[in-house]
Amino acid sequence: MKKIRKGDRVVILSGNDKGRSGEVIKVNPGESKALVRGINMVKRHQRQTQKQEAGIISKEAPIHLSNLAIADPKDGKPTRVGFRMNADGGKVRFAKRSGELIDG
């Protein structure tokens, strides 16, 4: 089970966007990287296609998972993730900082 998943709210721990938070759009476990909405924006030169105009566009660049931490559901501060078994025998994630469940 992965600690960071698509849709999670994360806090950036290092880099230009340190301290900012955003939602995970995509996780690439093979490269240990994730895309976070509105974070680590880079400019790309776009070639013209039938659907898009040419020009310079801003898009998210991947961030290494070691530079991300789950935001605590209680107060939004960075927390580590733990796993515990629920009553049904399924594995659920919880915030070690507050004990709150991350999986609804």
Swiss-Prot record:
Protein name, as recorded: Large ribosomal subunit protein uL24
Family assignment from sequence similarity: Belongs to the universal ribosomal protein uL24 family.
InterPro entries: KOW, Rib_uL2_dom2, Ribosomal_uL24, Ribosomal_uL24_CS, Ribosomal_uL24_KOW, Translation_prot_SH3-like_sf
Organism: Bartonella bacilliformis (strain ATCC 35685 / KC583 / Herrer 020/F12,63)
GO cellular component, one term: ribonucleoprotein complex
Cited Gene3D superfamilies: 2.30.30.30
Subunit and partners: Part of the 50S ribosomal subunit.
Coiled-coil stretches: none
Keyword Protein transport recorded: no
Database matches in Pfam families: KOW, ribosomal_L24
Chain segments annotated as transmembrane: none
Gene Ontology MF annotations: rRNA binding; structural constituent of ribosome
Keywords: Ribonucleoprotein, Ribosomal protein, RNA-binding, rRNA-binding
GO BP terms in the entry: translation
Origin: domain of life: Bacteria
Function noted in UniProt: One of two assembly initiator proteins, it binds directly to the 5'-end of the 23S rRNA, where it nucleates assembly of the 50S subunit. One of the proteins that surrounds the polypeptide exit tunnel on the outside of the subunit.
